């Protein structure tokens, strides 16, 4: 292999080309590659953060859903207790009203019974006086009659 001036000229030209590329071409290419690498790393970090945020949001949503279900169950339980309480109160009021109506009816019955007894006593007294008049054949004095009726009514 012959080393001649052409080979030396080509080597010098190649060396100048390499130096030119290292000085003017290579730094922008390296900078562009570093920027691209940084953008890719930032994108991956953002994707990881988004995945973590999504997972946290899903956990939070699940927790809120469980809390809402628990609150709903508690509200339903309170409603059932309140309904049972209202039913018990209504039953108690109905029982009190029934007792009042029963007492009033018993009082009316007692009053009517007493009225019937008084009327019956008066009729029995009149019948007794009438029967006595017929037996004796004479009328009895009015004062004596009233006294006998009262005595008879008291005995009855």
Curated annotation (Swiss-Prot):
GO MF annotations in UniProt: proton-transporting ATP synthase activity, rotational mechanism; proton-transporting ATPase activity, rotational mechanism
Subcellular localization(s) per the UniProt record: Cell inner membrane
Cited InterPro entries: ATP_synth_B-like_membr_sf, ATP_synth_b/b'su_bac/chlpt, ATP_synth_F0_bsu_bac, ATP_synthase_B_chain
CDD domains linked: ATP-synt_Fo_b (cd06503)
UniProt key word DNA repair: no
Principal location listed in the UniProt entry: membrane
Transmembrane segments: 12-32
GO cellular component: plasma membrane; proton-transporting ATP synthase complex
Domain of life, per lineage: Bacteria
Keyword Transmembrane carried by entry: yes
Matches recorded under Pfam families: ATP-synt_B
UniProtKB keywords: ATP synthesis, Cell inner membrane, Cell membrane, CF(0), Hydrogen ion transport, Ion transport, Membrane, Transmembrane, Transmembrane helix, Transport
Membrane topology: Single-pass membrane protein
Database matches in Gene3D superfamilies: 6.10.250.1580
Family per record: Belongs to the ATPase B chain family.
Quaternary structure annotation from Swiss-Prot or TrEMBL: F-type ATPases have 2 components, F(1) - the catalytic core - and F(0) - the membrane proton channel. F(1) has five subunits: alpha(3), beta(3), gamma(1), delta(1), epsilon(1). F(0) has three main subunits: a(1), b(2) and c(10-14). The alpha and beta chains form an alternating ring which encloses part of the gamma chain. F(1) is attached to F(0) by a central stalk formed by the gamma and epsilon chains, while a peripheral stalk is formed by the delta and b chains.
Role description: F(1)F(0) ATP synthase produces ATP from ADP in the presence of a proton or sodium gradient. F-type ATPases consist of two structural domains, F(1) containing the extramembraneous catalytic core and F(0) containing the membrane proton channel, linked together by a central stalk and a peripheral stalk. During catalysis, ATP synthesis in the catalytic domain of F(1) is coupled via a rotary mechanism of the central stalk subunits to proton translocation. Component of the F(0) channel, it forms part of the peripheral stalk, linking F(1) to F(0).
Name of this chain's protein: ATP synthase subunit b
Native species: Pseudomonas putida (strain ATCC 47054 / DSM 6125 / CFBP 8728 / NCIMB 11950 / KT2440)
Taxonomic classification: Bacteria, Pseudomonadati, Pseudomonadota, Gammaproteobacteria, Pseudomonadales
């Amino acid at each position: 292999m012959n080393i001649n001036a052409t080979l030396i000229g080509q080597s010098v030209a190649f060396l100048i080309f390499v130096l030119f590329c290292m000085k003017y071409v290579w730094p922008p290419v390296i900078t562009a590659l570093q920027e691209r690498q940084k953008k890719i790393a930032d994108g991956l970090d953002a994707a990881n953060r988004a995945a973590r945020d999504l997972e946290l949001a899903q956990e939070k949503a699940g927790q809120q859903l469980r809390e809402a279900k628990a609150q709903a169950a508690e509200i339903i339980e309170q409603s059932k207790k309140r309904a049972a309480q209202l039913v018990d109160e209504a039953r108690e009021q109905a029982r009190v009203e029934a007792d009042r109506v029963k007492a009033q009816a018993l009082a009316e019955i007692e009053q009517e019974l007493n009225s019937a007894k008084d009327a019956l006593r008066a009729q029995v007294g009149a019948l007794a006086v009438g029967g006595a008049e017929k037996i004796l054949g004479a009328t009895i004095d009015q004062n004596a009659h009233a006294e006998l009726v009262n005595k008879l009514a008291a005995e009855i």
